[in-house]
C-alpha cells in the first residue's frame, strides 16, 4: 500500500482522504471492500491514528465509506451511483435560482449520525406494546426525565429533579406552557432579537418587548449563553455571574436556552446559568435537534422550584406533544452511553469539515479573505474584501447557485471588508473548491 505524501501544503489527513476517494471513484476499491483498521492503516502509512481517523471520518461524511459497529469501515456503492447522475440536474438553473451549494441551511451531516443504531433503539421501543397502548405522560415519560436529570447534572451542571422537567416537541411548544406560568411578568427582552419563533410566543401572550436589559424589572430575559447570536458569542463565567446578580437585584426571570452548548471546538462548555444559581431563578431549555437529528422533535424545560407548583396546577390542561416511542428510545440511547459518543463523533466530523473549508477559502481567495472557525456551531466566518455590501453579495452568489449568510452589520465596511457566514454541514468536502470559486467570481 503506497500513497503520495510530498505535497506539504495539504494536511496529511486530507492527502489520505483524497487517496482513498480516488481509489473508490476509479473502481480500485469496490463496493463492500473493507478498509484497513485505523490502527493498521496508521502503521502502514506511518501516520498517527488521529490522522487516519480524521480521514476516515471525512470519507464517511461524504458517503464514500460506512462504519459498521465492531467491524470496521467499508466502501459504499457511491462510485456506481455517481455514474448514473444526470449531469443536467447538477447544473445551476439560473432562471429558478436553484441553490447548488447551500452554506446557509442549518442541518446535521448525514454521516455524523448512526442511523442503523438509532433504528435498533426505535425498534426496541416499538416492541413495547403495553406502554404504547396508552397516552404519554403530559410532563414526559418518568424514566426519560430521570435520565435527563443525570445527564444534565453531569454534562451541564444543571441542578434538578425529574419533577422539575417538562418534555415537549420543540422549544416553541414549551414556551407556550411557560408563558401562562409567569403571567405576572409582563415584560420580556431577548438578547438575540432574531429568534422570531420565541418572540412570536410572547407576543401571543401580550408581553411588552423591551430592547434593553435594564428595562425588565420583574420581567423575563431570554438568552442563549453558549451561542448568543447566529454569529456565535459565548458568555464568560464573569458575565454569567454578573447577569445572575442583576437578575436577583431587579427580580427578573432568566430563560436560558442552552442551544449548541455541547458543541465547543476549542474549550470545554461553560457551566449552565441554572447550575450557577443553585437551580433557582432560571428556566433552562434544551433540545436534541443538533445532538441527534432535527427531525427528532424532542426538547425539555427545567422549571425552578418556585414554578413547579404553579405548573402542577395546570398540568392537566396540556397533552404531551413529543413522541412517546422516541422518548423511550432516547432514554436507553443515553443510558448506553451513545449520546455522549454521538456528540464526540459529530464534533470531530464538523471540525474537520470546517477546517478544510477555511483552508480552501484561503487557498482560492488568498489575501482577499480572512477566516475564523466558529467556537460554537458548525460555521466558518469569512471577512472579505469587496465593493459590495454583504446583503448585495448574498444576492449575487444566489444567482450563481451559492447560498451564503450575510452579516447584518457593516462595521468593517470602512476598510472595504464585509462578513459572511458559511455552514459547512450541508455541502460535501469535494465541492468546497467549486463553491468558493463561484464566491470569488461574485466579489
Where are these regions (language model features)?
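N-terminal basic, amphipathic alpha-helical segments
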Residues: 1-123, 130-133, 312, 316-323, ...
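Short glycine- and hydrophobic/aromatic-rich loop-to-beta-strand nucleating segment
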Residues: 73, 222, 300-303
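Short, polar loop motifs at secondary-structure junctions
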Residues: 89-91, 193-197, 213-214, 408-412
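Short beta-strand segments
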Residues: 105, 190, 211, 222-224, ...
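Short, solvent-exposed loop/turn segments at secondary-structure junctions
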Residues: 106-110, 172-173, 194-196, 226-229, ...
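Conserved core of the PLP fold type I
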Residues: 125, 129-250, 255, 261-263, ...
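PLP-dependent aminotransferase class I/II
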Residues: 282-363, 370-372
Amino acid at each position: 500500500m503506497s500513497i503520495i505524501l510530498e505535497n506539504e501544503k495539504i494536511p496529511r489527513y486530507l492527502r489520505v482522504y483524497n487517496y482513498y476517494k480516488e481509489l473508490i471513484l476509479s473502481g480500485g476499491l469496490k463496493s463492500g471492500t473493507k478498509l484497513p483498521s485505523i490502527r493498521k492503516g496508521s502503521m502502514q502509512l506511518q501516520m498517527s491514528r488521529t490522522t487516519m481517523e480524521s480521514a476516515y471520518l471525512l470519507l464517511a461524511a461524504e458517503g464514500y465509506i460506512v462504519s459498521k459497529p465492531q467491524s470496521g469501515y467499508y466502501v459504499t456503492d457511491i462510485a456506481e451511483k455517481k455514474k448514473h447522475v444526470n449531469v443536467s440536474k447538477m447544473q445551476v438553473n439560473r432562471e429558478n435560482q436553484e441553490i447548488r451549494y447551500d452554506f446557509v441551511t442549518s442541518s446535521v451531516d448525514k454521516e455524523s449520525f448512526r442511523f442503523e443504531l438509532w433504528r435498533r433503539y426505535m425498534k426496541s421501543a416499538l416492541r413495547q406494546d403495553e406502554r404504547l397502548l396508552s397516552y404519554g405522560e403530559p410532563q414526559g415519560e418518568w424514566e426519560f426525565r430521570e435520565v435527563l436529570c443525570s445527564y444534565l447534572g453531569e454534562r451541564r451542571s444543571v441542578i434538578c429533579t425529574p419533577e422539575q422537567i417538562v418534555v415537549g416537541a420543540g422549544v416553541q411548544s414549551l414556551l407556550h406552557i411557560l408563558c401562562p406560568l409567569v403571567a405576572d411578568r409582563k415584560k420580556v427582552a431577548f438578547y438575540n432579537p432574531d429568534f422570531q419563533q420565541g418572540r412570536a410566543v410572547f407576543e401571543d401572550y401580550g408581553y411588552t418587548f423591551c430592547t434593553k436589559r435594564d428595562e425588565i424589572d420583574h420581567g423575563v430575559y431570554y438568552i442563549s449563553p453558549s451561542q448568543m447570536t447566529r454569529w456565535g458569542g459565548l458568555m464568560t463565567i464573569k458575565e454569567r455571574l454578573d447577569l445572575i446578580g442583576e437578575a436577583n437585584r431587579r427580580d427578573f426571570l432568566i430563560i436560558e436556552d442552552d442551544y449548541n452548548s455541547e458543541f465547543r471546538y476549542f474549550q470545554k462548555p461553560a457551566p449552565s446559568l441554572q447550575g450557577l444559581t443553585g437551580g433557582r431563578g432560571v428556566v433552562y431549555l434544551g433540545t436534541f435537534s443538533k445532538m441527534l437529528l432535527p427531525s427528532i422533535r424532542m426538547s425539555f424545560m427545567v422549571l425552578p422550584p418556585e414554578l413547579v407548583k404553579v405548573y402542577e396546577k395546570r398540568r392537566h390542561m396540556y397533552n404531551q406533544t413529543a413522541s412517546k416511542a422516541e422518548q423511550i428510545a432516547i432514554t436507553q440511547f443515553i443510558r448506553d452511553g451513545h449520546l455522549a459518543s454521538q456528540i464526540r463523533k459529530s464534533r470531530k466530523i464538523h471540525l474537520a469539515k470546517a477546517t478544510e473549508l477555511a483552508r480552501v477559502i484561503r487557498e482560492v481567495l488568498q489575501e482577499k479573505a480572512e477566516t475564523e472557525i466558529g467556537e460554537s456551531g458548525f460555521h466558518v466566518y469569512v471577512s472579505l474584501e469587496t465593493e459590495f455590501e454583504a446583503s448585495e453579495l448574498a444576492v449575487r452568489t444566489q444567482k450563481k447557485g451559492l447560498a451564503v449568510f450575510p452579516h447584518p452589520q457593516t462595521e468593517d465596511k470602512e476598510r472595504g471588508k464585509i462578513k459572511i457566514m458559511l455552514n459547512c454541514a450541508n455541502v460535501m468536502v469535494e465541492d468546497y473548491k467549486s463553491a468558493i470559486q463561484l464566491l470569488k467570481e461574485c466579489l
